[in-house]
Amino acid sequence: MYRKDSIIIEEWLKRSDKALLVTGARQIGKTWLIREEIAKSGYRKFEVNFIDQPDLVDYLNVKMSANEFLVKLKMIMPEDCKPQETVVFFDEIQKCPEIVTKIKFLVEEGSFKYVMSGSLLGVELKGITSVPVGYLTVLRMYPMDFEEFMIANNVSKTTLEMLKAKFETCQPVDEFIHQKLLWLFFIYLIVGGMPDAVKIYIATKDIREVDKVQRDIVALYKEDFSQYESEDKKLKLISIYDIIPAELNKQNKKFVFTMLNKELKFDRYENSFLWLKDAGVALPVYNVEAPVVPLKASKSSNVFRLFSNDTGLLTSAYPAETKLELINKNSEVNNGAHFENAVAQQLTANGLEPYFCKKKNIGELDVLVEMDGKVVPIEVKSGKAYKAHKSLDNFMKISDCHIEKAYVLSVANMEQEGSVVYLPIYMCYLLKERKIGKLIVDLDMEGL
């Protein structure tokens, strides 16, 4: 299946003289993609998986010089793994984090190219004291976004190019195509972007089979909670993770700590929230006090909404009736939790950091992001009244905010009224920062 990150790995294999670290949550396709790109590149691959080969953890994860490490590594490599022709792939690196500290030497020595991958790296690498800055490229992967899901479901390149053109010119999509893509988006809300779930959907079209895959993935996540943390912290992590669907289903989607424990104070659970974020299984979207650049400067670390890393995993936690309503595109039902989770997931995958903003006497903005140096508000509407956005109108009138353009995502077709663009929800994947090519600054200093 097509993954956008394949281009990054392909470019790294061709040109980079650094090591590559691919991180992200479990089951998002990291290992598969690395193997695919190495196979296409013509390089020989030597792979070490520290879960499947636990004896190699003791062999390589001990205190030794970088030179000793390289000697030991070469001793377990086949003879046909020749220098300059081989990529060494360390998988499940969270089990052997000491290797990260050796990367600077290994890169400088130059015999092989090195790629590392694993889950929970945001958690496990926090204890590493010597991360090789300047010698390591980090690629953060996410579940498949809606564009990748469309490609997996045989949406043509011509259609994708048409959507991009319509987005750039604010022109409506042909109604027949619009309805087809809207239906596919509702399917995406159920299936999500976990590659195994997408594969089983494409093969069977059976949502029940998809649900089995999703429940297995959730079970793996909870197994990780147990494997890497104490019993007390494991229970906190499971409690927080399990309550995400209920919290998002409320009208006020802000995470309320007393839902976990009436006596709870945020600082008792703060590390658990951060653990879920660092592990890549949850996406916190923080409140900001001021909708101005930089948004991060006014974020409230204890006021946030907590989303699932994958809309399909979120939907799997709801009753079967919820899936039927989504399949039927029932706009009378409140699908706000699913829509907002999908938007948070997509914006994050696009490299943006979503926030929300709630201010007295003005209202609440669903999403705020920074794009091209400007604050862009985004309203997410799952019902028919998508043009009713009083809070957005209030924010647009505040001169201090300097808001030039806003988006309303809904099931409606594309149109623009003033500075508000009404965007079909399936076009969310097109909201990203513009790519800047070469920026050459050539100053003539002669004569100074």
Where are these regions (language model features)?
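Domain-level recognition of nuclease-like catalytic cores that cleave nucleotide substrates
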Residues: 412-448
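Structural recognition of the conserved hydrophobic beta-strand(s) that form the central parallel beta-sheet
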Residues: 113-119, 140
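Pre-Walker A adenine-sensing motif
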Residues: 1-14
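Short glycine-rich substrate-engagement loop in P-loop NTPases that contacts/grips substrate
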Residues: 52-83
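Accessory nucleic acid-recognition modules appended to NTPase machines
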Residues: 194, 199-365, 369-372
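Interdomain motor-coupling "hinge/lid" segment immediately C-terminal to the ATP-binding subdomain
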Residues: 126-249
